[in-house]
């Protein structure tokens, strides 16, 4: 059942529950583990040759265990007592006049799901106290410990398990994390719809990016999950196009791939629509193929399905569609066997989504010799509670396709005369955020994708 995410988000981020899950994983790998888990948040870093700080993005491993967005913090979880302690910066009287009063320890205790809050001036003393005793181990993350932090009292220092433990736990989301993703999707949808309504009036891609950012911030999402893609015409054939600065005149479609972040949790949504308000014949043909790819692969999702097989299904649907309109020709089984469809659908079907847009835990194998699976960011079975993007696409990128046209293995399956009519389509991608459940899935993305509805909105704007 769809929960009221706003009600869920009135509670605290369940950091203690996350810490207990991570601790259980560590103990499963080191059964006699005693000691602590130790993580640090991101530290304030100044711009080079400047007295301004770099834009701050909280370290995700730290946030997962604390729910704390503050800079310059530390965290300890005692494996023996399951006590969690957050360390925050003390008040610096010299900075108050510039920045105002920071969060106090008492306030932080009310805000974050931890057992105790102390100041960072106490970190090393607390580490020394907890390290006393036989066979104590500190579990920390390699290259994420300040030089000023000392683990001298601990018999062992393990820098290999904790990162993996957090990443594995992050794959399966709890109700609060799902609510954060719903909220991010809701705000992103407002911004997406604003762009659809304005696209016919826009002269340049940058106007649309500015509008998306404005609507995001106005609705409380100050951070984007990633650099948005506002690709007009043939630029849509570039998968991660980020220039967003080209004129729109004379171009058929806009590919909009953008998502806001809500309290460190990402949304990742892509829509493609006609700038004029009416799809060209070729654009609509490709759109319908991609929409079928997305709807049918999403319908096949549930706990335990193998993502590789869902990706393969997407290619089969793409081959059927491209064969029907004449771009591909010959035996469809041979087209699949020779991987010719990779020329038009060169990326993976999707990825895990969470605190990072391309979230952890996917077990990708970029050394795979099979080009159909090489860029698949998730491999293996999907657990219930995971969130994946489903983002099939068909693209007409000359740099990618032309080598296929010159290769006799592939060229016999591609009708270059028919293909010539499709270059201006650029690329079509449709992307939603999907929650995997025991018996199926739930689409968390309410953004309009019906092609007739998109045309109506643009024409009426």
From Swiss-Prot:
GO terms for biological process: proteolysis. It catalyses: Release of any N-terminal amino acid, including proline, that is linked to proline, even from a dipeptide or tripeptide. Mn(2+) 1 binds at residues 268, 391, 431. It comes from the Eukaryota. Its cofactor is Mn(2+). The keyword Signal does not apply. It is an enzyme of class 3 (hydrolase). Keywords: Aminopeptidase, Hydrolase, Manganese, Metal-binding, Metalloprotease, Protease. Mn(2+) 2 binds at residues 257, 268, 431. GO terms for molecular function: manganese ion binding; metalloaminopeptidase activity. It holds the Pfam family Peptidase_M24. SMART domains: AMP_N. Its EC number is 3.4.11.9. Binds 2 manganese ions per subunit. Catalyzes the removal of a penultimate prolyl residue from the N-termini of peptides. Belongs to the peptidase M24B family. This is Probable Xaa-Pro aminopeptidase PEPP. It comes from Colletotrichum graminicola (strain M1.001 / M2 / FGSC 10212). The lineage of its organism: Eukaryota, Fungi, Dikarya, Ascomycota, Pezizomycotina.
């Amino acid at each position: 059942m769809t929960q009221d995410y706003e009600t869920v988000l009135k509670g605290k981020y369940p950091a203690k529950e996350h810490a207990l899950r991570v601790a259980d994983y560590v103990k499963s790998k080191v059964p006699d583990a005693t000691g602590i888990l130790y993580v640090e948040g991101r530290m304030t870093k100044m711009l080079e040759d400047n007295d301004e700080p770099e834009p701050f993005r909280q370290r995700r491993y730290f946030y997962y265990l604390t729910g704390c967005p503050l800079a310059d913090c530390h965290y300890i979880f005692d494996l023996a007592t399951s006590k969690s302690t957050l360390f925050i910066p003390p008040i610096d009287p010299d900075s108050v006049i510039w920045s105002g009063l920071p969060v106090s320890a008492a306030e932080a205790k009310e805000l974050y799901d931890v057992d105790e809050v102390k100041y960072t001036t106490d970190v090393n003393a607390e580490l020394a106290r907890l390290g006393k005793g036989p066979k104590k181990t500190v579990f920390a993350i390699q290259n994420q410990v300040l030089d000023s932090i000392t683990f001298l009292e601990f018999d062992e220092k393990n820098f290999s398990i904790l990162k993996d433990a957090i990443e594995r736990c992050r794959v399966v989301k709890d109700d609060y994390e799902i609510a954060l993703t719903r909220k991010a999707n809701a705000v992103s949808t407002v911004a997406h719809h604003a762009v659809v309504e304005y696209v016919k009036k826009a002269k340049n891609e940058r106007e649309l990016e500015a509008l998306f950012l404005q609507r995001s911030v106005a609705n409380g999402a100050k951070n984007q999950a990633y650099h948005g893609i506002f690709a007009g015409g043939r630029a849509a054939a570039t998968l991660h196009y980020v220039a967003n600065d080209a004129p729109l005149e004379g171009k058929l479609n806009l590919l909009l791939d953008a998502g806001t972040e809500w309290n460190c949790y990402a949304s990742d949504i892509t829509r493609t629509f006609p700038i004029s308000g009416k799809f060209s014949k070729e654009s609509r043909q490709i759109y319908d193929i991609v929409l079928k790819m997305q709807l049918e692969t999403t319908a096949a999702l549930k706990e335990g399905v193998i993502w590789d097989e869902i990706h393969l299904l997407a290619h089969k649907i793409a081959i059927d569609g491209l064969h029907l309109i004449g771009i591909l020709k010959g035996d469809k089984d041979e087209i699949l066997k020779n991987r010719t469809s990779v020329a038009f659908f060169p990326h993976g079907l999707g990825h895990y989504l969470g605190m990072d847009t391309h979230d952890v835990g996917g077990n990708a194998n970029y050394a795979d010799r099979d080009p159909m699976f090489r860029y698949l960011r998730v491999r293996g079975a999907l657990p219930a509670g995971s969130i994946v993007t489903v983002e099939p696409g068909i693209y007409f990128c000359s740099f990618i396709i032309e080598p296929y046209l010159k290769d006799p293995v592939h060229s016999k399956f591609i009708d270059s005369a028919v293909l010539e009519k499709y270059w201006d389509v650029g690329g079509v991608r449709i992307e939603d955020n999907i929650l995997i459940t025991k018996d199926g899935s739930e689409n968390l993305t309410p953004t309009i994708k019906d092609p007739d509805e998109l045309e109506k909105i643009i024409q009426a704007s």
